[in-house]
């Protein structure tokens, strides 16, 4: 009888705990309701638009503002920086059965097409354009000439095509038309002009150029990624064969210059055309030529080019953002995506072989030819740091765990698994196994609360159906809720002043719920995309802070203000 009473008491306690702790879908539902209420249009009375602010102070409800150098304030609403949220809204409708969230996402897309698409097809969004939620007027930092720019944004084209197929197709064509400066040699740039007259587009002639040919436009991979992704989706949804030809052609430009011995690279397939001279090493404008060559060339020779710099940040673009996007395209496009899968997995294997330090879970900073730059002291000022800066190995974080785990589900390769396994161990997740599902001993007491880790575990679970991975994902999900969900919003640090409505914690929790229900298709695949806003920002003392990014504002704790960055 005593045993029965104790058992009954334990059951009641567990039941009460369960009742007191909302399930993950309820949490995401609460969060989304808070976003739609507090980040919504509060400025237009009985006729509010469906638009949303990018950031919210959870304590006061104040919407995050951009302060221009002339002192004007604007409530920042940048649709390119809300694409993860759009995926959350659709996924929440799919899992909850409540269509209103998807309908809100559709309304936001429709509103942008109706009000913020120019004659060339481009939208008012991206790194240097946004909408002031107060006035509904397009805005942008003037020193960037209000150009169009996307970097690893990966808009939710699936939704956009479902809302307005022709407007989405117009945008993608306009995107390529504005950002490919010379189709014959594939000269691209991260900056595109609005209002451009449509050219020959997919019918343009092309002649393959040698690796690292000199151009005025800078072929950064983070900008190339969005071009590749958009044209591939245009082919998928609109059957424009030429779009896929050019998408794969652009993707290949980043493969052809890879070092022949190591297979590493590249971040750019061109180098900056030298158009002027300077004796000031600290002036890193691209008109003075390739910035890596200026800073590293005297010691390392002609291979020291920006495209060959395998440094922190650049490698995230190559082996995380690009990798996740191309792995997904490879799956979506079937036989047409086979090359994308091969290029991506080959690159990840090369990076694993030459850069990964399993002993301390770091990546070596390198040149693409394999030259290890660990602990190298910069001999002069330049693009990569001040004279005297020491280049250090950098941690292999959960974003790399995700890209290597996802690649392994496509190609079960031992080198890919070695990196995923090593990162997981270092990130407190325990032992993933000698291979997927073999000798598994995960740590179900982990304190890991990183949504990237959760996404990675879900990939491994979907590929292997090993329950241990799902159980560990649930634990990480619980940790996310207990440590990052405060005042009705998700924030990596509860002391932050503003919550970012595009944060990925609710996205990861929805993906987890979908996996538990065996409905993974209910939530869009995670691509690690993110928009941004950058430009001149007015400091409290009235000075202008050049090249301020919105993520710097999101990193401020309550009571903190931006510090000078000394950029010119």
Where do the PLM segments sit?
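Hydrophobic h-region of N-terminal signal peptides that target proteins for export
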Residues: 10-18
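Glycan-recognition and catalytic cores of secretory/periplasmic carbohydrate-active enzymes
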Residues: 19-568
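Sec-dependent signal peptide recognition
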Residues: 2-8
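Generic cytosolic/nucleocytoplasmic N-terminal low-complexity/intrinsically disordered segments
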Residues: 1-2, 567
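Enrichment for repetitive, rod-forming helical segments
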Residues: 9-10, 94
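A ubiquitous, low-specificity "background" feature that marks scattered single residues
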Residues: 8-9, 508
């Amino acid at each position: 009888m005593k045993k029965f009473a104790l058992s009954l008491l334990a059951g009641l306690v567990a039941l009460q705990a369960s009742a007191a702790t909302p399930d993950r879908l309820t949490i995401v539902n609460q969060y989304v309701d808070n976003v739609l209420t507090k980040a919504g249009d509060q400025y237009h009375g009985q006729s509010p638009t469906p638009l949303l602010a990018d950031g919210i102070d959870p304590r006061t409800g104040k919407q995050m503002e951009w302060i221009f150098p002339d002192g004007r304030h604007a409530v920042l609403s940048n649709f390119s920086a809300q694409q993860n949220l759009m995926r959350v809204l659709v996924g929440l409708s799919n899992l909850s059965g409540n269509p209103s969230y998807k309908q809100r996402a559709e309304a936001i897309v429709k509103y942008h097409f109706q009000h913020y698409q120019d004659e060339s097809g481009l939208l008012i969004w991206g790194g240097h354009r946004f909408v002031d939620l107060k006035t509904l007027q397009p805005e942008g930092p003037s020193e960037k000439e209000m150009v169009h720019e996307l970097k690893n944004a990966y808009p939710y084209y699936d939704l956009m095509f479902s809302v307005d197929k022709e407007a989405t197709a117009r945008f993608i064509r306009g995107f390529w038309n504005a950002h490919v400066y010379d189709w014959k040699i594939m000269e691209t740039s991260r900056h595109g002009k609005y209002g451009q007259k449509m050219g020959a587009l997919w019918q343009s002639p092309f002649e393959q150029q040698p690796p690292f040919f000199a151009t005025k436009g800078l072929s950064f991979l983070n900008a190339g990624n969005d071009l590749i992704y958009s044209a591939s989706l245009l082919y998928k949804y609109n059957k424009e064969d030429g779009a896929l030809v050019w998408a794969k052609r652009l993707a290949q430009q980043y493969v052809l210059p890879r070092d022949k011995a190591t297979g590493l690279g590249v971040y750019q397939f061109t180098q900056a055309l030298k158009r002027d001279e300077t004796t000031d090493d600290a002036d890193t404008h691209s008109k003075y030529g390739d910035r890596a060559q200026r800073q590293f060339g005297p010691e390392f020779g002609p291979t020291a080019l920006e495209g060959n710099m395998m440094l922190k940040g650049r490698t995230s673009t190559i082996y995380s953002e690009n990798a996740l996007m191309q792995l997904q395209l490879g799956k979506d496009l079937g036989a047409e995506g086979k090359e994308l899968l091969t290029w991506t997995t080959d690159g990840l294997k090369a990076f694993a072989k030459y850069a990964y330090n399993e002993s301390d879970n770091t990546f070596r900073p390198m040149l693409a030819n394999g030259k290890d730059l660990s602990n190298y002291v910069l001999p002069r000022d330049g693009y990569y740091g001040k004279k005297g800066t020491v280049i250090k190995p950098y941690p292999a974080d959960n974003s790399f765990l995700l890209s290597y785990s996802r690649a392994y589900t496509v190609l079960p390769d031992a080198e890919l698994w070695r990196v995923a396994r090593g990162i997981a161990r270092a990130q407190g997740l325990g032992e993933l196994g000698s291979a997927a599902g073999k000798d598994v001993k995960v740590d179900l007491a982990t304190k890991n609360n990183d949504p990237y880790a959760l996404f990675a575990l879900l990939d491994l679970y979907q590929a292997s159906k090993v329950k241990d991975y799902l159980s560990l994902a649930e634990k990480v999900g619980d940790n996310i809720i207990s440590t990052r969900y405060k005042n009705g919003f998700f924030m990596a640090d509860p002391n932050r002043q503003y919550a970012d409505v595009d944060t990925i914690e609710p996205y990861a929790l929805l993906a987890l719920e979908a996996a538990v229900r065996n409905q993974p298709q209910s939530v869009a695949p995670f691509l690690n995309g993110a928009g941004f806003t950058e430009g001149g920002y007015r400091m409290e003392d009235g000075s202008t802070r050049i090249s301020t990014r919105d993520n710097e504002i999101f990193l401020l704790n309550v009571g903190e203000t931006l510090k000078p960055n000394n950029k010119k």
